[in-house]
Amino acid sequence: MLETRALGYHPATAPRPLLEGLDLRLPVGEPVLVAGRSGSGKTTLLELLAGLAEPDAGQILWRGELCSAQQRRWLCGLVFQFPERHFLGLTVAQELRLGHRRLEAERIEAVLEQVGLAGLPAQQAPERLSGGQQRRLALAVQLLRDPQVLLLDEPTAGLDWAVRDEVLQLLLDLAKERALLVVTHEPELFQGRVAQAWRLRGGQLEPLPTMQPGLRP
């Protein structure tokens, strides 16, 4: 389980902390949702958990032990809201192999099938993919690292309804074997699909009373 205790973050240019006294638990197998308006600190929370930034206060723990930023970078896989801005490979194949000295073709094919991209042309440019395909490709890149925690920034934003349902089901399947946190401004899409649902407001987490806990069968 990934856990925060009294987590705080105060940007130097902000009049007040963006996150303050934040306690959050991400158990394996129980997807968690954090909703909030733009600028509420959702993405900052993901960056702290992923080891891309350091909190000003509090602790981040994995299985009860303090977890450094470097450890969190190995532990967590972060998929950004706009993955196309973070693609570095000129082709799908290059993007998938970045950072891997050795990666068997069978492993790549298995992950692409897992995210619904079986048969995707390896020489296709990532920026030529549809929005839904780009999200899936970014997810495949992270899954190849075999992270213990998946952190997803607005995974359904801008997708049509049919693709949204497919992505939602994929996320639930992935959450069975790892900790998973989704941040979104569309919490209603996850109704009945998550174990915990929170709203980030004023730097703190509040329960979302309209969200029913528990996964869909």
Q: What does each model-found stretch correspond to?
A:
Residues 50:
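Helix-to-loop junction immediately C-terminal to a conserved catalytic motif
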Residues 58-74:
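Conserved ABC transporter NBD signature motif
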Residues 105-121:
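Conserved ABC ATPase "signature" region
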Residues 125-129, 133:
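Conserved ABC ATPase signature
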Residues 142-143, 174:
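ABC ATPase C-loop
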Residues 150-154:
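Catalytic Walker B motif of ABC-type/P-loop ATPase nucleotide-binding domains
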Residues 160:
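ABC-family nucleotide-binding domains
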Residues 178-184:
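Conserved H-loop
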